[in-house]
């Protein structure tokens, strides 16, 4: 490997045959000798302690404006080679390397001290150049963002020669490479932190966008409410609180806004005006489009609907699509009409319930709306739509319950004060005594407020579905009404309250009695409550009607696989079993003998229903006589097992109704007589 040290121009290299005739060395002064030894030794030590870097390639920057192109030459080219001056041109050291130098022509013409002085200057220049590579210029000023590059270069290179300019450029290149490596190390060191911060920034950006949307909605709310943007009170010139005109018109503007909402809904949904008349305070709370209605039994899609949730009702609107295509002349108008929404259902929110169906399999984003025995299933496109609809319904329910509670409290306060006398009255009584005293000197001089308290107790008992307590209160009220017949005002007030509350109690008990999941003990208890209210006939009709509906429900669940005899057998089992159980339940609930005729009439109707279904199966053209006889035998067998053995013998009725001949007065069929 070649040495990194360059040949010095001060010490010539040539053949050993070249000899210099120095002559006798004159004595040197002592001070010059000491100066020379100290200076040369210092330079040599400094030179030996220098570190030399590797071969680094530096790109050549463009020349400075107004300056010579000093970057094209080697940055280190002038550190060791000096142009010989006039005083060195004649010396062997100055002419070393010249093309016209001959070995024979080199002669020593300079004294020894002059030659040693030239060597010291060359060594000093090399040492100064190497020592100032890192210390000559302060490049830390360039790290300041506000530094003026032109001013800095002008300050540093003022009066500099070509050598200093080259050294400055080399220092800049080294600083550039060092900064580049430091930047790479910093990037690699903080890469994981950079990725984490980027994720946090993206999350924060989404949160800011959501906050921006919410702030926009909040900003539009005062305008929709007919209010000013600011809710802070304003003061007039005198410092008094100023009333805004918008406060006076806020209620009126809000009603106009609600009316405009309903008008727009009428124009969008055909037939909605019939369900949604203008009512004070009625407004649209939430609407959802693109909802798919599912079959409650199979969960198969039926149609696309739109849901409109108002503060008191729920409107379901389907889309009406014309089967026929539109002509070109009136195409635009018919296309607009095609797909128009039509109101299908409208439910009161008080009677309504929404159930969140848990996601599973293909059943995703499904809600179930039930009203009594009616059930509807809907599927939304997104889970957010489903959640928003359920939250809106719950919020409206809470507001309705809160409003109902406040109205109840106001009603109670009104009832407490409605019977108090007016202080400014016309002298009908003292201010401290009620106006509705029952007689001036009755033993019981209580006012009529107890009637209101009685009505509140009965209302509360009905609300919490305590039927036993409700019936006791009704019986108490009926007894009190008979005892106060002499006082027309109290009697009329009590009777009016009973007439108002008893129908509600009876309807709710009847609804529970008509349930298909009712047990024997529960039905007997409910029937006894209605009997205590002198509604035995109503209880009988409600109970028997519910049993008839249950029978038809069980009949519809029978599968018909083509074998008529099996179908008739299952039909007879279902109908005869329900008749038998109904007889047992009926006799357990109604103890009076005069109520038995009602059950017999009902049982006769069910036997006739069975006979009608039986004849429909037998009247088919492909039914053979053997099949008919087999069906008759099955019917007679089930009649004996389920009815006749427990005392319900309807053989005569079945024999006459199932007689194959056209004359029902013929003798009973042999099957019924033989079984």
Curated annotation (Swiss-Prot):
What highest taxon heads this organism's lineage? Answer: Eukaryota
One Gene Ontology biological process: protein localization
- Tell me the SUPFAM superfamilies matching this sequence: Cullin repeat-like (SSF74788), PH domain-like (SSF50729)
Keyword Transport attached: yes
Location in or out of the cell: Cytoplasmic vesicle, Secretory vesicle
Keyword RNA-binding, does the record have it? no
Ranges for region Disordered:
1-40, 399-439
Show the InterPro entries listed in the entry: Cullin_repeat-like_dom_sf, Exo84, Exo84_C, Exo84_C_1, Exo84_C_2, PH-like_dom_sf
Tell me the keywords, alphabetical order.
Coiled coil, Cytoplasmic vesicle, Exocytosis, Protein transport, Transport
Q: Which GO terms describe its cellular component?
A: exocyst; transport vesicle
Q: Where is the composition biased (Basic and acidic residues)?
A: 399-416
Any coiled-coil regions, as ranges: 134-221
Q: Its principal location?
A: cytoplasm
Kindly give the CDD domains that the UniProt entry links to this protein: PH_RalBD_exo84
- Say which family it is in: Belongs to the EXO84 family.
Self-association or partners: how does it assemble?
A: Component of the exocyst complex.
Function field: Involved in the secretory pathway as part of the exocyst complex which tethers secretory vesicles to the sites of exocytosis. Plays a role in both the assembly of the exocyst and the polarization of this complex to specific sites of the plasma membrane for exocytosis. Also involved in assembly of the spliceosome.
Protein name according to UniProt: Exocyst complex component EXO84
Q: Which organism is it from?
A: Cryptococcus neoformans var. neoformans serotype D (strain JEC21 / ATCC MYA-565)
From which lineage does this chain's organism come? Answer: Eukaryota, Fungi, Dikarya, Basidiomycota, Agaricomycotina
Q: Quote the gene name from the UniProt entry.
A: EXO84
